Amino acid sequence: MKQPRLLPALLLALLMLLPAGCGTQTTGTPQQTSTPTETVTASGAAGTLRVQVPDGWKYEVCPEGTLDDSEACFGVKIWPDSGSDSCVQLYWSDSFGVCGMGLKEETLTLAGDSVSTGYYDGDKNWTFLSYQGKNSGTVAWTDPNAPWFAAQGEQMLAVLDTVEWEPAA
């Protein structure tokens, strides 16, 4: 009598275990996007910043003195969702600093280098990325509550994985 009940229970257990072994594994490095892209370049006295922006995303090149950080800052504002007011400001700064109150930092690898990733007040989404190594001085800043984060946060990290900084000669 117990045998007819055992088979459905085994099948149910097997079905519950299958999804755990499938899918993509998160390794701390975003997956590359296969969407066609455009190379966006921002230049200033300190050098040149490049990033690959997917087709369909909005961007604005910001010359020196047009961003909030300092007069020397320049970069690109990137909107993954054309209907959103919230963007990522990707820029080079000679004086980036943050307040430590409520800050938790983790390290990612993007564009072949270590990146300090800042989360404030328990947010699950990052507020800033500060590149080290060959891309040192490059910063990405955004609103961690932006509506596009849920659907396009990983794709944004893939875009930020394409950052290239070339210091002036």
PLM segments and residue spans:
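Hydrophobic helical h-region of N-terminal Sec-dependent signal peptides
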Residues: L10-M16
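Signature of long, low-cysteine stretches enriched in small and polar/charged residues
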Residues: S95-A151, P167-A169
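N-terminal low-complexity, Pro/Thr/Ser-rich intrinsically disordered segments
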Residues: T27-L49
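C-terminal motif of bacterial Sec signal peptides marking the signal peptidase cleavage site
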Residues: L18-G21
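Short, hydrophobic/aromatic-rich segments at coil-to-beta transitions
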Residues: S34-T41, A72-G75, T109-G118
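Secretory pathway targeting signatures of secreted, lumenal, and periplasmic proteins
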Residues: T41-V98, Y120-T127
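Bacterial signal peptide processing site
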Residues: G23-Q25
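Bacterial N-terminal signal peptides that target proteins for export
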Residues: M1-L10
